[in-house]
Design a protein with these regions (language model features):
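N-terminal pre-P-loop "Q-motif" helix
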Residues: 7-11
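S-adenosylmethionine/decaboxylated-SAM
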Residues: 2, 12, 16-259
Length: 259
């Protein structure tokens, strides 16, 4: 696994080059879309044949933030992040506004479909609405709590083509992540034991992104070649160390430690 000193957007362009080498226009999906900002970056970088955006855009998403009442002392209340969402977290109008903001970004893209549903309910809608059976890339950025992210990984692996990718957002342990009750890294650690996916690369950043692919896929070699021949600095470590990843914050920048 390559620990790359870069940002997630560079990964998108790297994978675009890999898809181009395979003469493929990828079919892609994003789970957890919010305003559509990252989805638009994915679209512009990957030039997909089709794209599916899946999000409930619903205050019901708050229900899974934590099973405990009162919250543990180390977890901040979900309402603490209302500023990021543009309004009260329990107000449907906040989510309706986010949904409309997202749609406005893709109004001229007729190959983009938005499905307003939670990630699991959306599965049975994908094929009837879009005709898509398999994705070449699924970006997972929906509910970040352990049980939910593990469920998304377990279900959506079956919708990923044999040589397809899963990209996972916010996959690190950090002080800020703990405040949000993130369980992404822990879910990935469990998923790797239950599947044939392996991590190929991770960004050396807070809120790290990870590229996953099946261990016997040709994409293991192609991504390795693409990174090795790029100008992206990296160090390589055994992928089994991914579960030890934690953010170390210094005065100048953050780094990922596996010690």
């Amino acid at each position: 696994m390559k620990v790359c000193i870069t940002h997630r957007e560079i990964f998108y362009h790297l994978l675009h080059a890999v898809f181009q080498a395979c003469e493929k226009k990828p079919v892609i999906a994003e789970l957890g879309v919010l305003r559509g900002e990252n989805a638009l970056k994915l679209y512009n970088a990957l030039a997909p044949e089709k794209m599916v955006l899946i999000d409930s855009w619903s205050p019901a998403a708050n229900d899974a933030y934590s099973p405990f009442d009162p919250l543990p002392a180390w977890v901040e209340p979900v309402d603490s992040y209302a500023y990021y969402y543009g309004g009260p977290m329990d107000d449907p109008a906040t989510w309706d506004a986010l949904y409309q903001e997202c749609l406005s970004k893709f109004v001229e893209m007729d190959n983009v479909t938005a499905i307003r549903a939670d990630t699991i309910s959306a599965i049975e809608q994908i094929q009837p609405i879009t005709g898509i059976d398999k994705f070449d890339l699924v970006y997972i950025d929906a509910n970040h709590q352990y049980e939910y992210i593990l469920r998304d990984l377990m279900y959506y692996q079956d919708l990923v083509a044999d040589d397809g990718f899963i990209l996972l957002n916010d996959c690190c342990h950090s002080h800020l992540g703990t405040k949000q009750n993130l369980g992404v890294l822990e879910a990935l650690s469990s998923f790797l034991k239950r599947s044939d996916f392996i991590p190929l690369a991770v960004t050396n950043t807070d809120w790290s992104d990870v590229i996953l692919v099946r261990k016997n896929s040709i994409m293991v070699k192609l991504v390795d070649m693409a990174l090795t021949n790029s100008d992206i600095p990296f160090v390589e470590i055994p992928h089994q160390l991914i579960s030890a990843a934690k953010v170390i914050r210094g005065q100048q920048r953050v780094n990922i430690s596996f010690a």
